[in-house]
Design a protein with these regions (language model features):
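Hydrophobic transmembrane alpha-helices and immediately adjacent juxtamembrane helices
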Residues: 2-278
Length: 278
């Protein structure tokens, strides 16, 4: 039986120190091939722009989407896109657990004094993915400057809080969906429906979704707290489910609860892992 909470002789601070060194080594290795690294970084920026192109085409045909103007939807796009991109850099490697379980190589993660999740993240860390942050970051800056927001202190604070909480939500979703691999092995497509699919959902107001899907992204997989509720709070827009705009203030608590749930599920999954040789 594996111990997923093993933290080595120096505790969690020691683990984070080891993680930073492993990530640093990975970055230095990638930087040895600078031309390739830069090209891959630029390609990530261009790929991120495809979703924005779809939104631009949509607003070439309509003036507003469920009462949201182009700049207001751009605000959704920026908040969700930045959060997703940062989570992609640090947490998307969790989905590789299924590949290692299937190949019988997950056992090696259990023999080292570092949590398997951090080993997965550090081992496949790719800084080039940070290129996906650039484009939604620019869109977010333009949207914040161009929309009519009453910049009270609480609204100013909401922007970094929403970005941090949204990153945690996406990271937790990656870990949760990847945990299923310990029972079914093949989970990447299942996980993509909630991670990459969830990123697409955060780009639009939930007003355009059907009632059951609105409830799903609000109460089950709380993607509405990534961009929709924070943006509605900034813009003082009403919610189709009748929730007050202050629902956005629950964003940090929701992200923390989801992160704790993800940790519990992952730990339980690793604890009951049986290697191919057992």
């Amino acid at each position: 039986m594996a111990d997923p909470d093993r933290t080595g002789s120096h505790g969690w601070r020691g683990e984070l120190g080891v993680y930073r060194r492993l990530v640093g080594a990975r970055i230095r290795s990638d930087w040895q091939y600078r031309a390739s690294f830069v090209l891959l970084l630029v390609s990530q920026v261009l790929v991120a722009g495809l979703d924005l192109a779809v939104i631009a085409v949509l607003f070439g045909r309509v003036d507003a989407l469920a009462g949201w103007t182009a700049l207001e939807v751009a605000l959704l796009y920026g908040l969700g896109g930045v959060a997703f991109a940062v989570a992609d850099v640090f947490a998307s490697q969790a989905e590789l657990a299924g590949r290692h379980i299937k190949a019988g190589t997950f056992d090696r993660f259990l023999l080292r004094p570092l949590s398997p999740l951090l080993q997965l993240s550090a081992g496949e860390f790719a800084l080039r993915r940070a290129g996906r942050v650039v484009q939604p970051g620019v869109v977010l800056a333009v949207a914040l400057a161009g929309t009519d927001i009453d910049w009270t202190p609480d609204r100013v604070a909401m922007v970094p809080v929403a970005l941090a909480s949204g990153t945690v939500v996406f990271g937790a979703v990656w870990v949760l969906t990847s945990s299923v691999a310990f029972w079914t092995v093949e989970t990447q497509e299942f996980g993509n429906a909630f991670t990459y699919g969830g990123n697409h959902l955060t780009q639009y107001p939930i007003d355009v979704l059907g009632p059951w899907l609105r409830r799903l992204v609000t109460f089950v997989v709380p993607l509405a707290f990534v961009a929709y509720f924070p943006a509605a709070y900034l813009l003082d827009k009403p919610d189709p489910l009748g929730a007050p705009s202050e629902a956005a203030l629950l964003t940090p608590a929701v992200s923390l609860a989801l992160a704790l749930a993800a940790r519990a599920v992952w730990s339980n999954a690793v604890r009951h892992y049986r290697s191919t040789g057992s």
